[in-house]
Amino acid sequence: MLLIPAIDLKDGHCVRLKQGEMDDATVFSEDPAAMARHWIEQGARRLHLVDLNGAFAGKPKNGAAIRSIVDEVGDDIPVQLGGGVRDLDTIEHYLDNGISYIIIGTAAVKNPGFLHDACGAFPGHIIVGLDARDGKVAVDGWSKMTGHDVVDLAKKYEDYGVEAVIYTDIGRDGMLSGVNVEATVRLAQALRIPVIASGGIASIADIDALCAVEAEGIMGAITGRAIYEGALDFAVAQARADELNGGEG
């Protein structure tokens, strides 16, 4: 199982938000490229970037920081990016400039046709990000709840040809309260494509719990606050996941 470090970008810095609130941000590094290199040195095999300003503005906003990370990472490991992706030109630009996977979140819910077109134009490169509370999907940086059931939407997007689904449990993200394994497994069991867990990972116990159900279709887990604040040692956690699951995966 892949443990994927999150690098959340706000105003060119690496930050973490608590419960998705832009004005409740903790700056962890003013050098995102150095942070990317740090996680690679700790054993990361994929990076998760979020353009937070872009997510709220609906268009790319942290171009310089993203470029610096891509330049630093090179061909070492794949990078997935979300936040502010609302059109095919933006996707093409990122893919042409070193990003491996594009995450589409709010735009997928509000404009399913865009997601469908993106999957057709860039097969194998589109990941859908679904943020949910109590099984219902949220959009616009979690500021608006919808009536959409997360499993129903994910199955629809699977038919479009998305590469994977990132499932974030909003109630737990950035709170170090433990990952919602039950909800993640329920989604993974309903799909043929892999699920990447996100939100709430706090300790080695969460890694153990996810590895125990990896066979249900959980390919990885995104971790942020825990590895930045020291609650979770990334290198130890990735080694633990490899040990439990018999190697890289």
UniProtKB/Swiss-Prot annotation:
The record ties this protein, via Pfam families, to: His_biosynth
Q: Which reaction does it catalyse?
A: 1-(5-phospho-beta-D-ribosyl)-5-[(5-phospho-beta-D-ribosylamino)methylideneamino]imidazole-4-carboxamide = 5-[(5-phospho-1-deoxy-D-ribulos-1-ylimino)methylamino]-1-(5-phospho-beta-D-ribosyl)imidazole-4-carboxamide
Q: Which UniProt keywords apply?
A: Amino-acid biosynthesis, Cytoplasm, Histidine biosynthesis, Isomerase
Listed under GO biological process in this entry are:
L-histidine biosynthetic process; L-tryptophan biosynthetic process
Where in the cell does this protein reside?
Answer: Cytoplasm
Q: What is its EC number?
A: 5.3.1.16
The record's annotation in Gene3D superfamilies points to:
Aldolase class I
The annotated pathway is: Amino-acid biosynthesis; L-histidine biosynthesis; L-histidine from 5-phospho-alpha-D-ribose 1-diphosphate: step 4/9
| Name used for this protein in its record | 1-(5-phosphoribosyl)-5-[(5-phosphoribosylamino)methylideneamino] imidazole-4-carboxamide isomerase
Q: Which organism is it from?
A: Aromatoleum aromaticum (strain DSM 19018 / LMG 30748 / EbN1) (Azoarcus sp. (strain EbN1))
